[in-house]
Amino acid sequence: AAALKERGFAITGSDQGIYPPMSTFLEARGIEARPFDVANLAYKPDLVVIGNAISRGNPEAEYALEHKLAYCALPELLKHQFLRGKHSLVVCGTHGKTTTASLLAWLLEHNGLNPSFLIGGIPNNLGQGARFTDSEWCVLEGDEYDTAFFDKRSKFVHYLPEAVVINNLEFDHADIFGSLAEIQTSFQRLINIIPRNGLLLAN
């Protein structure tokens, strides 16, 4: 949301509750988050971005579907707005994604590459969890969780990976994966889209 606002988009958001540090971060950037209500979409926005925590029955999701509003999931938006033409470095695995992605972004930053990054936390040494620059380098924390109720692929398959770091794999997310083998299949789909000139680092 903050990165899109910096690009000149008008942004509004809805959630059940946002708490520090994220609420503080959004408030400092003038981004208002409201409780879910169909009135939030009455002005017919150009695009509705539906998060993966949203399921059928959510009033705003139902409104978007019923009124044929353009919608997409966040990973798809990232791909089209921020990742095309970049060297996407995707850090994934069951544990250690945030730490490893933060370290990788910091290394690129301190080597003068001014990377874009999207990390599932706010690293102390970077001051924010997301930043999109004109640099050709982008570090993404890649999550194997599903993209949205209308797209059950793992989020990381949208990230146009050029290099992938897999920290580790264990059985996780029992709400969407039935076994470790299913998780491994999801990671194999990510590996399958690394280009021939790309890189895979697997622990």
Predicted regions and their residues:
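Short amphipathic alpha-helix with an adjacent loop that forms part of the alpha/beta core around
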Residues: D37-K44, K155-V157
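Phosphate-binding loop of NTP-binding sites
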Residues: A3, E27, N52, R56-A202
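ATP-dependent carboxylate-amine ligase
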Residues: A1-M22, L26-A33, K44-V48, E66-L69, ...
